[in-house]
From Swiss-Prot:
The keyword Chaperone does not apply. Disulfide bonds join C5-C37, C12-C31, C19-C38, C26-C39. It comes from Heliofungia actiniformis. The lineage of its organism: Eukaryota, Metazoa, Cnidaria, Anthozoa, Hexacorallia. GO terms for cellular component: extracellular region; nematocyst. It comes from the Eukaryota. Peptide with unknown function. Does not exhibit any effect on human ion channel TRPV1 in a Xenopus laevis oocytes assay. It is found in: Nematocyst; Secreted. Expressed in tentacles. This is Peptide Hact-SCRiP1. Keywords: Disulfide bond, Nematocyst, Secreted.
């Protein structure tokens, strides 16, 4: 896990869960119905 991300990089999270900065929410891929939590490089 990453303290910056609040979630594992690339972790699938519920669609209404907001990824914490400095992250952004990837679209529904590759997790149908879910968002993918991504860290900025």
């Amino acid at each position: 896990q990453s303290e910056f991300c609040g979630h594992d990089v690339g972790e699938c999270v519920p669609p209404k869960l907001v990824c914490r900065p400095p992250t952004h929410e990837c679209l529904h891929f590759p997790c149908p119905g879910y968002l993918k939590c991504c860290c900025y490089p």
